[in-house]
Amino acid sequence: MKKIINTPESFVYDMCHGIAAAHPELEFVEQYKVVKKREINEDKVTLISGGGSGHEPAHAGFVGKGMLDAAVCGDVFASPSQVQVYNAIKRTKSNKGTLLIVKNYSGDCMNFNNAA
């Protein structure tokens, strides 16, 4: 399969900026590689997931109305750090709590658990 990538070093940032540009209701927090809704409904449980990049549009492709409130993007085939996950939790907090959707990958399990 062929993919169009400007440079491997900027791939994740390019992808996240593109998703945010195509969907004005979303924003990209570049420092932590988090794609999130601009407006968070604080009267519902917020949903966050994430994982390694390279299988786009997962996970950022699931951010939107009726789906995730934020996605944390790791580097290509690498889990996001606990600092990235923690900042996603802080930026999407609600009065009803936050549910982290974690897949069964050891790096994701460890970093999402430590961030919580």
Region spans (language model):
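Structural motif
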Residues: L26, K44-I48, D75, K96-L100
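Fold-independent oxyanion-binding glycine-rich loops
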Residues: H23, G50-S53, A70-A71, V102-Y105
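N-terminal amphipathic/basic leader segments beginning at the initiator methionine
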Residues: M1-L47
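Glycine-rich phosphate/diphosphate-binding loops that line cofactor/substrate pockets in enzymes
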Residues: V34-E42, N87-K96
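N-terminal glycine-/lysine-enriched basic segments
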Residues: K96-A116
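Glycine-rich oxoanion-binding loops at beta->alpha junctions
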Residues: H55, F62-N95
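Glycine-rich, flexible N-terminal cofactor/catalytic loop recognition
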Residues: V34-K65, V72
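Conserved active-site and cofactor/substrate-binding residues in soluble primary-metabolism enzymes
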Residues: N6-D14, E42, G54, A58, ...
